[in-house]
Amino acid sequence: MNTVRVTFLLVFVLAVSLGQADKDENRMEMQEKTEQGKSYLDFAENLLLQKLEELEAKLLEEDSEESRNSRQKRCIGEGVPCDEKDPRCCSGLVCLKPTLHGIWYKSYYCYRK
C-alpha cells in the first residue's frame, strides 16, 4: 500500500513539475508569437500606409489637373454675333463679317473655318 502511495505521489509531483515547465514554455512561446505578430502587423501597416499615400498623391494630382483645365473659357458658338476686335469664338470658329443674309445686321458672326 505504501508503494502505491509513493508511486502515486511521485507521478503526481512529476506531472505537476512538467506541467509547470510546459506552461512556462507555452507562455514564452505565446510572447514570441505576439512579438512576431506585432512586427508583421507593423510591416503590413506600413505597406498599407505607403499604398494609401500613393493613391492620395495620384488623386490630388488628378484633381489639380482637372481644376486647372476643367472648364473652358466662355466662348461664342456658331452663328452668334461677335466683336471683331475681341473675338471669343469657340475653337474651330472664326469671327467673320456675314455674307448675304446677315448684311443688314452690320455685325460680325462666328463661322466655321
Curated annotation (Swiss-Prot):
The entry's note on the tissues where this protein occurs is: Expressed by the venom gland.
Say which domain of life the source belongs to.
Eukaryota
Q: Where is this region: Disordered?
A: 61-82
Indicate whether Chaperone appears among the record's keywords: no
Query: What is its subcellular localisation?
Result: Secreted
The scientific name of the source species is Cyriopagopus hainanus (Chinese bird spider)
Query: Care to name a GO molecular-function term for this sequence?
Result: sodium channel inhibitor activity
Q: What is its main location?
A: secreted
Query: Can you cite an annotated GO cellular component?
Result: extracellular region
Keyword presence, Signal: yes
Name the InterPro entries on file.
Toxin_22 (IPR012627)
- What keywords is this UniProt entry annotated with? Disulfide bond, Ion channel impairing toxin, Knottin, Secreted, Signal, Toxin
Under which name does UniProt file this protein? Answer: U11-theraphotoxin-Hhn1q
Question: What does the sequence similarity comment in the record state about its family?
Answer: Belongs to the neurotoxin 14 (magi-1) family. 01 (HNTX-16) subfamily.
Q: Which residues form a coiled coil?
A: none
Q: What is its biological role?
A: Probable ion channel inhibitor.
Propeptide segments, given as residue ranges: 22-74
Q: Spell out the disulfide connections.
A: 75-90, 82-95, 89-110
Tell what the record comments on domains. Answer: The presence of a 'disulfide through disulfide knot' structurally defines this protein as a knottin.
Query: Which residues, if any, are the signal sequence?
Result: 1-21
